[in-house]
Structures are given as structure tokens and as C-alpha cells.
């Protein structure tokens, strides 16, 4: 018999007000990306630097659709990929690779977006010559 995965939902009480606001903003950005059709299931991702002195950032959990992302489901990780605040979700490995490199190199980057828009895909496939 399999056991249900227990996902903590009380993340708000475990983070600062600044981090919670960042979580809300990033979750809203995920929802907007889904609304405009700029997502392609789990292979695009957004991240946001967590306010404060530590080099932590928030990333979508692996396997969660963009329209399902919430402030509590975002995974908080460091630049080495270690989960800083366990919320029961797994790290998006592809997202970590891209976002950790950018956040590590650019302290001024507060948010990073990696998207596959239809227009961008068409250009990358050379279907549209520019």
C-alpha cells in the first residue's frame, strides 16, 4: 500500500514578511506565464532571489504545472542546490542549473525568467528568418 505524500502548507509562518511577499509575487508571475501560454509544462522556469544576506532563491517545484504554483509550493534553495526550507517538493534540476548560475554571477538579478514562447521557438528553429 502506498502512503500519501504529506505536504506542509504552513510556510508563511516559517518565513519573513519580505520572503512571503517575494513568494506571492513569483507565484503570480507563474500564473501569468501560464495564462499567456508561455509555459511548456515543466521545462520553463522562473526564479526570484530571497531578500536578505544569504544567497537563496525560490524556484518552481518539479512536476507542478505553472497554473498550480503557489507561494507555499515554491522551493527555497541555495546556490549549491541544497533545499533550505523543506516544503515536501522536489527541486527542479533543470531550473536549478540555469538559475543558480545566473543568481551566482549576478547579485543584482532579483528575478530570472526562462521561457519558451511560440515566437522564440519559431526563431530558434529558423522557421522565421530575421
Model regions and ranges:
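Long, non-catalytic terminal segments
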Residues: 1-111, 122
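Ordered, amphipathic secondary-structure segments that act as subunit-interaction surfaces
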Residues: 111-117
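Short active-site loop/helix that positions an aromatic residue
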Residues: 120-126
Amino acid at each position: 500500500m502506498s502512503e500519501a505524500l504529506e505536504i506542509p502548507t504552513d510556510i508563511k509562518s516559517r518565513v519573513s514578511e519580505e520572503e512571503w511577499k517575494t513568494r506571492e509575487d513569483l507565484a503570480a508571475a507563474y500564473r501569468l506565464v501560464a495564462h499567456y501560454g508561455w509555459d511548456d509544462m515543466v521545462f520553463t522556469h522562473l526564479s526570484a532571489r530571497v531578500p536578505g544576506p544569504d544567497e537563496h532563491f525560490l524556484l518552481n517545484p518539479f512536476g507542478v504545472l505553472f497554473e498550480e504554483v503557489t507561494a507555499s509550493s515554491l522551493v527555497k534553495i541555495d546556490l549549491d542546490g541544497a533545499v533550505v526550507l523543506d516544503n515536501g517538493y522536489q527541486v527542479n534540476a533543470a531550473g536549478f542549473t540555469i538559475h543558480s548560475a545566473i543568481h551566482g554571477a549576478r547579485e543584482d538579478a532579483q528575478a530570472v525568467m526562462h521561457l519558451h514562447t511560440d515566437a522564440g521557438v519559431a526563431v530558434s528553429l529558423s522557421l522565421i528568418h530575421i
